[in-house]
């Protein structure tokens, strides 16, 4: 088995938000992800990079058990959130996903109003007891998603009527309305134009003050701009993980250097 390489910096246990040990994923007989060991830090943006099909999105979905929804998918090894095994039989995946929110590649607002898109999670999780409390949560989430000023006069309008970039910010507001501890983002800018992408990247930088953010991206430039730590996946393995500056300027594994320089991918 190939070694997993880490940066020199020693990370204390209380900085670690999510930890994976020997994480493996199977789709039926296909061994899609092998022996991933990684510590994801609190209030940090971590980027997952690598060629298409390398396992980065598969691993991202492990972190809030979205792979549970895929027939024939099996996850082995151990993944913890604040030290608790998220695959323990006593863990409710729905409650886990309130703590570990997710934003997908393509904006997917519910066929509801802007207001109801954001209010949906707090309602089903019982996070508010009154209309006033729901109003406060909705406004707060839209403000943190940098959408309040554009949406405050049209909260009853369909979320699907927003532009692509606005829809993605609405999906971010929806994800953070349940006060998660971690926000997973699977190529959140791939369907957006450069202006909307820049807005989302600025938002990601602001969100890390409150959340751990994990982003899958095919854009190495984006990973370099928004993340503090980067993990490079290749052929179902985590090849190298460390501080973003080190990964991009002084990678330790030749496969990482080959990918960053464009020789593989």
Curated annotation (Swiss-Prot):
<dbReference type="GO" id="GO:0015415">
    <property type="term" value="F:ATPase-coupled phosphate ion transmembrane transporter activity"/>
</dbReference>
<comment type="subunit">
    <text>The complex is composed of two ATP-binding proteins (PstB), two transmembrane proteins (PstC and PstA) and a solute-binding protein (PstS).</text>
</comment>
<dbReference type="InterPro" id="IPR027417">
    <property type="entry name" value="P-loop_NTPase"/>
</dbReference>
<comment type="similarity">
    <text>Belongs to the ABC transporter superfamily. Phosphate importer (TC 3.A.1.7) family.</text>
</comment>
<dbReference type="InterPro" id="IPR003593">
    <property type="entry name" value="AAA+_ATPase"/>
</dbReference>
<dbReference type="GO" id="GO:0016887">
    <property type="term" value="F:ATP hydrolysis activity"/>
</dbReference>
<dbReference type="GO" id="GO:0035435">
    <property type="term" value="P:phosphate ion transmembrane transport"/>
</dbReference>
<keyword id="KW-0813">Transport</keyword>
<keyword id="KW-0547">Nucleotide-binding</keyword>
<keyword id="KW-0472">Membrane</keyword>
<keyword id="KW-0067">ATP-binding</keyword>
<dbReference type="GO" id="GO:0005524">
    <property type="term" value="F:ATP binding"/>
</dbReference>
<keyword id="KW-0592">Phosphate transport</keyword>
<feature type="binding site">
    <location>
        <begin position="50"/>
        <end position="57"/>
    </location>
    <ligand>
        <name>ATP</name>
    </ligand>
</feature>
<dbReference type="GO" id="GO:0005886">
    <property type="term" value="C:plasma membrane"/>
</dbReference>
<keyword id="KW-1278">Translocase</keyword>
<dbReference type="InterPro" id="IPR017871">
    <property type="entry name" value="ABC_transporter-like_CS"/>
</dbReference>
<dbReference type="Pfam" id="PF00005">
    <property type="entry name" value="ABC_tran"/>
</dbReference>
<comment type="function">
    <text>Part of the ABC transporter complex PstSACB involved in phosphate import. Responsible for energy coupling to the transport system.</text>
</comment>
<dbReference type="InterPro" id="IPR003439">
    <property type="entry name" value="ABC_transporter-like_ATP-bd"/>
</dbReference>
<dbReference type="InterPro" id="IPR005670">
    <property type="entry name" value="PstB-like"/>
</dbReference>
<keyword id="KW-1003">Cell membrane</keyword>
<protein>
    <recommendedName>
        <fullName>Phosphate import ATP-binding protein PstB</fullName>
        <ecNumber>7.3.2.1</ecNumber>
    </recommendedName>
</protein>
<keyword id="KW-0997">Cell inner membrane</keyword>
<feature type="domain" description="ABC transporter">
    <location>
        <begin position="11"/>
        <end position="260"/>
    </location>
</feature>
């Amino acid at each position: 088995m190939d070694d997993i390489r880490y940066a020199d910096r020693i990370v204390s246990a209380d900085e670690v938000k999510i930890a994976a040990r020997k994480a493996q994923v199977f789709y039926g007989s296909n061994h899609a992800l092998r022996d991933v060991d990684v510590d994801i830090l609190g209030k940090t943006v971590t980027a997952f990079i690598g060629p298409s099909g390398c396992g980065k999105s598969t691993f991202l979905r492990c972190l809030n058990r979205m792979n549970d929804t895929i027939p024939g998918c099996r996850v082995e090894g151990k993944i913890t959130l604040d030290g608790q095994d998220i695959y323990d039989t006593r863990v409710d995946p729905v409650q886990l996903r309130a703590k570990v929110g997710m934003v997908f590649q393509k904006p997917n607002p519910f066929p509801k109003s802007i207001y109801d898109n954001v209010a949906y999670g707090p309602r089903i999780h019982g996070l508010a007891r009154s209309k006033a409390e729901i109003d406060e949560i909705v406004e707060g989430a839209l403000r943190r998603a940098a959408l309040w000023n554009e949406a405050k006069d049209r909260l009853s309008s369909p979320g699907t009527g927003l532009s692509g970039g606005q829809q993605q910010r609405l999906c971010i507001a929806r994800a953070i309305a349940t006060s998660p501890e971690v926000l997973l983002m699977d190529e959140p800018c791939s369907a957006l134009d450069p202006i909307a992408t820049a807005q989302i990247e600025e938002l990601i930088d602001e969100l890390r003050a409150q959340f751990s953010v994990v982003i899958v991206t095919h854009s190495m430039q984006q990973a370099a701009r928004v993340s503090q730590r980067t993990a490079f996946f290749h052929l179902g393995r985590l090849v190298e993980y460390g501080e973003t500056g080190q990964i991009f300027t002084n990678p330790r594994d030749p496969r990482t250097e080959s990918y960053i320089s464009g020789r593989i991918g």
